[in-house]
A protein has these predicted regions:
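Glycine-rich portal/gate segments that line the openings of hydrophobic small-molecule binding cavities
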Residues: 77-115
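Hydrophobic ligand-binding cavity/cleft-lining segments
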Residues: 7-10, 14-76
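Hydrophobic/aromatic beta-strand elements that line small-molecule binding cavities or substrate pockets
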Residues: 39, 74-77, 97-102, 120-128
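Short, highly charged C-terminal tails/helix-capping segments
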Residues: 74-78, 172-186
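Hydrophobic residues positioned within well-ordered beta-strands of beta-sheet architectures
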Residues: 35-37, 86-88, 99, 122, ...
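Beta-strand/loop substructures that line and gate deep hydrophobic ligand-binding cavities in soluble
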Residues: 114-166
């Protein structure tokens, strides 16, 4: 297990930067990779989800991501800081992380990686209204030891984008199963 490291991120700066799909910023020796994707929640032929169902799904995912994120093999809440905020340990892509979870009801859940080999911030945001509901998954991650503009950086960013798009699809699928009254595996 990695030692806990204090990490903070300016969400206002993060939101301004999230207007593009992918880019990086040098942060000292390391590179911070920014990726954002916005996807429609309600595709034709799928179980319709309203804002409340999506919010409830994001809260469930924050507490136990295993049914929602295929690449995650372990998820355990380790400390509660308030009625809504907490820390959790996860295993993702065969690596252990500690994340601080901050739900901002009813529109965004922020996951701040405070320990592990890749630090940064991940946000899951509900956007627009029920007629055109969208889910934005964004991340700003510092990858230690990866040179900017390198093939390694592009490969890492590409694999993360692929993992997060799979997680979005799995998350929406789990939310639809819940909305349809079907059980979601724990």
């Amino acid at each position: 297990m990695h030692a806990k490291t204090a990490y903070s991120f300016d969400m206002g700066a993060y939101e301004r930067l999230m207007r593009r799909d992918y880019y990086h910023v040098r942060t000292g020796r390391n590179i911070m990779i920014f990726v954002t994707r916005q996807l429609p929640v309600n595709e034709p032929g799928e179980t319709h989800l309203d804002r409340a169902a999506v919010w409830d799904g994001l809260v469930l995912k924050a507490n136990n991501a295993l049914p929602f994120v295929p690449s995650m093999t372990f998820c355990e809440v380790t400390a509660r800081h308030s009625d809504t905020g907490f820390d959790r340990d996860i295993d993702f892509r065969r690596q252990r992380f500690t994340e601080r979870i901050t739900p901002e009801a009813p529109h965004r859940v922020v996951f701040t990686r405070i320990a592990g080999p890749v630090l940064g911030t991940i946000a899951n945001e509900i956007e627009d209204d029920d007629d055109d509901l969208r889910l934005r998954f964004s991340f700003a991650l510092t990858v230690e030891g990866v040179a900017g503009c390198s093939a390694a950086e592009q490969e890492y960013a590409g694999s993360m984008i692929g993992d997060y798009l799979k997680a979005v699809a799995a998350t929406l699928g789990a939310m639809r199963r819940i909305a349809a009254g079907k059980a979601v595996p724990a």
